[in-house]
Amino acid sequence: MDPYKYRSSSAYNAPFWTTNSGAPVYNNNNSLTVGSRGPILLEDYHLVEKLANFDRERIPERVVHARGASAKGFFEVTHDITALTCADFLRAPGVQTPVIVRFSTVIHERGSPETLRDPRGFAVKFYTREGNFDLVGNNFPVFFIRDGMKFPDMVHSLKPNPKSHIQEDWRIMDFFSHHPESLHMFTFLLDDIGVPQDYRHMDGSGVNTYTLINKAGKAYYVKFHWKPTCGVKSLLEEEAIKIGGANHSHATQDLYDSIAAGNYPEWKLFIQTIDPDHEDRLDFDPLDVTKTWPEDIFPLQPVGRLVLNKNIDNFFAENEQLAFCPAIIVPGIYYSDDKLLQTRIFSYSDTQRHRLGPNYLQLPANAPKCAHHNNHYDGFMNFMHRDEEIDYFPSRYDPARHAEQYPIPPVRLSGKRDKCVIEKENNFKQPGERYRSFSPDRQERFINRVVGGLSDPRVTHEVRSIWVSYWSQADKSLGQKIASRLNVKPNY
């Protein structure tokens, strides 16, 4: 075999998927899990390689959420939820915790206008007495996909064409035509709320399902929701074009100027909880990030308030070097087996190490404000002053000991390791319900945006037909209206 014949080039692409080392990949859609809903296994080398490779594609700009603005403030507990969690920073009403928050757009570059139709990031870093807690979410409560295996592909489809560097609807429509679970997210993105007026007037959500654990060790699934006290306001197309044309940094400036003027943005934090023992009663999977939890069944419970009362001192140090990761939690809060969350746990820290270096948590914006100690030494850009002689554990010469044990979810797992989809997909019910909740004029604007994306000349008749079928399954009249405007026959 000529070792140079198949040098790295797209001219020598294999007809099937492989790893970087050339091994065949038989499933490029699902992660390797314990059973259909269990945790993802680290031995899924293809997943790890795929995510690790993806995390290193751009430097030094964030691969997503590149365009952002930050501010500092505090979180104050207003309601007692100690029956649900033993988290120290939630121990009693009145307790305040310093925070730094970063808002962002998701897909577009660092200098792009803040008036583009795009999800918005809403990430909060709590500097607690028991270490940092990063609640890394968006302004929408759902996401496009439910398995992180598809995250690199999803972002690639939303990013500009690699040949022309132009974002094109035909690529987006093609990719998501393979993923009907994305419909719910599109009912948010293509709705009137798809372009927030600014960062102060938008909701926030933890998006993923986490777990709360109380002192007795009882666990509850939890969703986090931020609600702005000044209300939600959005821009329609004409307004967005006008504002973005005049100032491509209007949301950043609005946030900065409002805080400087003493008009401090504020959000209320609410949670929804589900007893894991009762999840089988639902017609959806509570660990499915493409679903919301009905508020009439799982009401919003108030927790506290977030106030941003101080602008950052340096954009590079407290925005570009500010790094979040869903893996950073505190006692009383834990992960769930949400497949997207499980992959975010790895991917976020990995991309920060790539972007900022292995010691990114030593940077002032990312470092905990409480005492901390471990044997993680040296590495690139290590600037922590250390004079210990003991860099191992245990030792009779160093009094450092284990921390007191705290409760974690008491979960037993069994199942066949496999790459598979969840059992309760139920992709169309919630998108249909959300569409029917819109007023007639709001429905019309939504339909116009859907049709606009599908009207790209390179969107094939096959892809249009698939989308008409999807929207028809969500709501028959919606599918008929889209089909009529696209001249596509509905296929029920």
Swiss-Prot record:
Catalytic residues, chain numbering: H65, N138
Matching Pfam families: Catalase, Catalase-rel
GO biological process: hydrogen peroxide catabolic process; response to oxidative stress
Molecular function (Gene Ontology), one example: catalase activity
Cofactors demanded by this protein: heme
Subcellular localization: Cytoplasm, Cytosol; Peroxisome matrix
Residue numbers binding heme: Y348
Top-level taxon of the source organism: Eukaryota
Keyword Disulfide bond applies: no
Catalytic activities: 2 H2O2 = O2 + 2 H2O
Entry EC number(s): 1.11.1.6
GO cellular component, one term: peroxisomal matrix
Keyword 4Fe-4S: no
Main location: cytoplasm
Keywords associated with the record: Cytoplasm, Heme, Hydrogen peroxide, Iron, Metal-binding, Oxidoreductase, Peroxidase, Peroxisome
Function: Catalyzes the degradation of hydrogen peroxide (H(2)O(2)) generated by peroxisomal oxidases to water and oxygen, thereby protecting cells from the toxic effects of hydrogen peroxide.
Subunit structure: Homotetramer.
Assigned protein family: Belongs to the catalase family.
Annotated protein name in UniProt: Catalase
Classification of source organism: Eukaryota, Viridiplantae, Streptophyta, Embryophyta, Tracheophyta
